[in-house]
């Protein structure tokens, strides 16, 4: 009989199956096949304090389990080949229990990449299931069930139905709420900057006045700014000093889960969830020039380790492709600063150095290629020499004022050869010390300090990682849960807490402070790491948490006052005659009929009902009914009056047409508004799927003649070639800036 290899996903099974002969059958469990029940608590606490999870097999996976049991009976050897992390170890344990085998009796094979060599090596070196890792995952699962199952009903009874709390979820939400609190109490402060333009077009800024150094907040008001400007205009200036320094730009480390999600968000516009979905495909197997195989290593990791073989391949490629000046004398090693990083794993890297982005483009889908290129280039970059830059500083001294000019020059591109370098050289002219210079222009500018920026998905993940909240596998799901539960909204890539989030966090801060305490959550993660390392008993961790937590639940049921906003108003509903109530929803307070859902009458607190949609004489192009004008967060729009039967919606104001043809089909290009802001798309959509987040321009790329777009990024505004193969980019001149 064949040997049986059990993995989680069908895609992974198909890829591994292509590497092995007829002696092996590779099948998938299709994820978790044994878990705590959805309909009950699922944890029994024995008299001696032992926690016994009551795992069950969900009905929908019974056919899979039946098939696995049948194959297991016929198999000569059964290999567990789930992912090498705690969750994978736990899935392997549950597979063994489901097919009625002793977990530690089954050989366990592990690999960081799905390639023929890696699978064959794993089969030659099987080990046992790591029960410490299994118990660490069981402890996490039971902790999350205890918090979610016991605290969520309390929130529902005291605030509003449908609310939930979670060990990682709630501490993450508090970070978002705290940032919004900072923004609400922020008071802007006035300050001024003064820019000087010296001869030969040398841009500078005020550095000192009357012998005192000027920093960002030194010039508090217009009076002081005016004094400096008037003085500088009549002063004579000389070059006081010239300084050139060489500095190195360090090579970036390879990607781990959090940094991949951050870079994919900022550079590709991918959400963390999308990044992990695409990375999963690249890991489990895609078409390549050498057949189906995984083209990146395992994507859920907090390690920066790299195999010596992979580094050796990268060094050979760098030497052959770029030359010896790009290759460090010794290989570069990196270590993770993440709390609890599992350094036995590898960083995320390509599995075949010969599968370059140029080759990969013919085999991968658009999103797969974008993410693969990001991973491939980062891996190469981490083994290349540092870039060298020259920074230039020049001081112009007058009788009272001193101005400072800065320049820079890229001396050696190093790793920028593969990652790209977006800054243009800004060279200062050759002047001599003591040489007289003329101040041609001077401009004072008023500013106000800005509140801290709201988190985007990338910066929130970075914050969670720095605080030790969660692990690589939990970052993306945590943000998704907060969105699903309507605790946050994401508008123009920024995370906003909803009204109900403030109410929930306030209650948790007052009565369950440890649940929203980042230090407590981080320490809990550290304890789970100790269980994984065999240094802490998982039952002790659960017992230490359970008793004080449950006492707070009992006390909370009695002492926490109801915050449900269902207060009688003493007024009657004009539609059905029932009493009107003052309620609190996810987006604030409102008045509603007590006869809901039979009567859906609502008004705002001032008694204004939701505005009736404005009728139009425009007919729906899908069903023929008339369109009406409705309001949304992003403004007014046209919607079909037959909603919800017909869900057709269109912008109220026709999109602006650009006087530029689509580079793909020649049709018109339209300026549109989407969830992430303004974008530009072909009028011939969906037949033509041209899209750009930069405004197309009439000018052509000087290197490849493709279309050029104007992009507004955090780092500034750039002209950029639309052809991804071409890396041409230049900074937009000051007089052409959209947001000066």
Model regions and ranges:
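Basic, low-complexity terminal or inter-domain segments flanking catalytic cores
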Residues: 2-3, 24, 98, 152, ...
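Metal- or metallocofactor-binding catalytic centers and their adjacent structured scaffolds
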Residues: 213-253, 435
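A short, conserved structural fragment
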Residues: 283-297, 485-494
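C-terminal or mid-to-C-terminal helical accessory/interaction module adjacent to the motor/catalytic core
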Residues: 114, 118-198
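Short, hydrophobic-biased segments on the C-terminal half of alpha helices
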Residues: 276-280, 479-480
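Intrinsically disordered, low-complexity regulatory segments
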Residues: 1-142, 150, 219, 223
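Structured, non-catalytic alpha/beta "coupling" segments that mediate domain-domain communication
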Residues: 14-38, 170-218, 381-426, 592-594
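Short acidic, hydrophobic short linear motifs in intrinsically disordered regions
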Residues: 242, 251-264, 290-298, 451-463
């Amino acid at each position: 009989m064949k040997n049986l290899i059990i993995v989680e996903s069908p895609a992974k099974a198909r890829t591994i199956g292509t590497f092995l002969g007829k002696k092996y059958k590779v099948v998938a469990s299709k994820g978790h096949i044994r878990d705590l029940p959805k309909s009950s608590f699922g944890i029994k606490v024995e008299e001696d304090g032992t926690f016994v999870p009551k795992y069950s097999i969900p009905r929908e996976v019974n056919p899979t389990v039946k098939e696995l049991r049948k194959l297991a009976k016929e198999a000569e050897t059964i290999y567990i080949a789930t992912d090498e992390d705690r969750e994978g170890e736990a899935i392997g344990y549950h597979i063994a229990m489901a097919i009625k085998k002793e977990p530690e009796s089954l050989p366990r094979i592990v690999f960081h990449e799905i390639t023929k060599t890696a699978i064959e090596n794993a089969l030659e070196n099987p080990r046992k299931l790591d029960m410490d890792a299994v118990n660490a995952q069981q402890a996490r699962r039971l902790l999350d069930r205890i918090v979610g199952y016991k605290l969520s009903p309390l929130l529902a009874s005291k605030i509003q139905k449908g609310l939930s709390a979670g060990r990682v979820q709630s501490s993450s939400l508090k970070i978002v709420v705290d940032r919004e609190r900072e923004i609400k109490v922020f008071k802007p402060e006035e300050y001024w900057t003064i820019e000087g333009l010296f001869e030969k077009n040398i841009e500078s800024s005020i550095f000192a006045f009357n012998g005192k150094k000027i920093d960002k907040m030194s010039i508090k008001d217009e009076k002081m700014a005016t004094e400096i400007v008037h003085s500088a205009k009549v002063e004579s200036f000389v070059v006081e000093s010239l300084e050139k320094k060489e500095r190195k730009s360090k090579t970036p480390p390879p990607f781990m889960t959090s940094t991949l999600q951050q870079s994919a968000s900022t550079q590709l516009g991918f959400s963390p969830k999308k990044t992990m979905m695409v990375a999963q495909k690249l890991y489990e197997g895609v078409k390549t020039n050498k057949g189906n195989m995984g083209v990146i290593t395992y994507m859920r990791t907090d390690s920066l380790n790299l195999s010596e073989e992979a580094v050796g391949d990268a060094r050979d490629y760098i030497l052959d492709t770029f030359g010896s000046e790009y290759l460090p004398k010794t290989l570069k090693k990196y270590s993770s600063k993440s709390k609890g990083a599992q350094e036995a794993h590898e960083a995320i890297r390509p599995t075949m150095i010969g599968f370059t982005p140029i080759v990969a483009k013919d085999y991968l889908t658009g999103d797969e290629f974008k993410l693969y290129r990001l991973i491939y280039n980062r891996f190469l970059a981490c083994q290349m020499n540092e870039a060298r830059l020259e920074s230039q500083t020049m001081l112009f001294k007058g009788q009272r004022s001193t101005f400072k000019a800065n320049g820079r020059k890229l001396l050696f591109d190093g790793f920028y050869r593969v990652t790209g370098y977006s800054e243009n050289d800004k060279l200062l002219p050759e002047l001599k010390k003591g040489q007289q210079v003329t101040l041609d222009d001077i401009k004072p500018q008023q500013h106000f300090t800005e509140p801290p920026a709201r988190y985007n998905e990338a910066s929130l993940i970075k914050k969670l990682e720095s605080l030790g909240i969660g692990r690589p596998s939990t970052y993306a799901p945590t943000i998704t849960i907060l969105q699903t539960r309507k605790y946050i909204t994401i508008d123009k890539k920024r995370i906003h807490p909803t009204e109900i989030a403030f109410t929930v966090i306030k209650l948790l801060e007052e009565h369950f402070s440890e649940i929203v305490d980042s230090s407590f959550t981080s320490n809990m993660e550290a304890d789970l790491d100790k269980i994984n390392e065999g240094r802490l008993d998982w039952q002790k961790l659960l017992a230490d948490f359970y008793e004080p937590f449950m006492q707070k639940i009992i006390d909370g049921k009695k002492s926490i006052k109801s915050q449900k906003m269902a207060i009688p108003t003493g007024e009657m509903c004009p539609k059905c005659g029932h009493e009107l109530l003052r309620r609190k929803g996810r987006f604030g307070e409102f008045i509603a009929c007590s006869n809901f859902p039979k009567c859906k009458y609502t008004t705002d607190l001032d008694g204004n009902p939701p505005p009736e949609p404005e009728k139009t004489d425009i007919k729906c192009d899908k069903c023929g009914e008339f369109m009406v004008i409705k309001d949304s967060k992003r403004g007014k729009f046209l919607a079909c009056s037959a909603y919800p039967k017909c869900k057709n919606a269109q912008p109220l104001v026709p999109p602006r047409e650009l006087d530029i043809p689509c580079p793909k089909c020649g049709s018109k290009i339209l300026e549109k508004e989407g969830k992430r802001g303004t974008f530009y798309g072909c009028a011939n959509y969906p037949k033509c799927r041209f899209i750009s987040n930069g405004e197309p321009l009439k000018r052509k790329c000087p290197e490849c003649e493709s279309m050029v777009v104007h992009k507004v990024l955090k780092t500034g505004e750039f002209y950029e070639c639309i052809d991804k193969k071409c890396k041409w980019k230049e900074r937009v001149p000051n007089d052409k800036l959209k947001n000066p």
